[in-house]
Amino acid sequence: QEHFLNRTKTKKLFRDVFALGRGKKWNFMHSGMFLDFLAGNQDYECTPWGMPARNIFGWQKPCYLLGEGYAKTFKELMETTDWETYGTGKYEKCANCMAHCGYEPTAANAALTNPLKAMWVALRGVRTTGPMAPEINLDKQRPAQYIFSAEVQKRLSEIHRDEAVAAKQKASTAA
């Protein structure tokens, strides 16, 4: 999180970049509504369950940027993650996040619920001037917990334990 630009700087950066292409000349692999959000024109909340990630440890809680736990199954991920405690304004680590993994799903949902707005953005391009959407209030966010390294060590220990058990079973079967 220390390497993220703050939200205002991110919005300004994207407005400057999009202004070079007059709002619609860039070929990004994201929806127009998400790009409009990056330029500060949409007021979205994070949808952390919208783009789940899986690695060798399992399904990452709540997203791949935080990795604050792992679930063995997708069902476990969805049922045991306290989704309401994550996102900008809810968790200190999420304060400056505008990443695709949480906001692209929100933008996709916005396009489905308001197709005329999505069409307008697609036709005119990303607006690069004028007022920005209001910021999310950060006053009630919970403090950050730094548990990623402990989670990785826990999972590595489980992998090593499982490998040792498998090797022991293989050796006893061969004997």
List each language-model region with its residue ranges.
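Short Fe-S-cluster ligation motifs
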Residues: 89-101, 123-155
